Amino acid sequence: MAKNESTGFSFSDVEVAVLKNFASINPSMVISPTGLSVINTAKSVVSFYDFNKPYSFEEFGVYEVPEFLSVLGALDNPVVEVNEKYLIVKSGDQKTRYFTTAKDLLPKVPSVGAKFEKVECELDFTLTADKLAALFKMAPIIKADWLFLESDGKKIRLTVGKELNTSSNTFDVTIAADIKANELKSPIKVPLSDLKVLPGGYDVKISSAGISRWSSDVGPVYYIGVKAN
């Protein structure tokens, strides 16, 4: 789809995919001309995505992003025009009027990048797309609730399961190349319910202070809370 139109704009396929993904974190968000940001209701996940090029529209709020995406998907090559209280979504001689939501009624997303840079991270590694896909594929099969991370300082093991014990079903992958890791006295765990990241590879940094950063090779950055096991 074309990036900008004289009478409006069109989201790219990648931007639509990120919108759909962010809506799984929280369906309500403010859409900015420079990018997207979202925070979940528990405030344990904050995510950001910058557009390749800024748009020229005024930022607007959407209460139900999945519904908004369905409106876009129902039209061929939709073009969006932003008005003060509503959007016009057009395709040829067809159009939909879709009302926006006041920004002060939607979750405010805090800036966390600068704070994260000051946090000491015990784990710093690259998680390839195939390893992430394998973890995500197996997790629902064995009814896993957590992603556990263990390190002896030389390699990092990522395990999905309900618990790390001999009576629980688990699945793990090991990363030994290009890592920066301290030996962990106890595992760090991430709730799989919070790990709503797009498929792909990630540069991952994890701190026992309770936060992790997952930087995608396709653009989004996710800050996700972690816990000591």
Region locations from a protein language model:
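DNA polymerase processivity clamps
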Residues: 2-101, 118-229
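Short, well-ordered, aromatic-rich surface patches in folded extracellular/luminal domains
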Residues: 100-110, 115
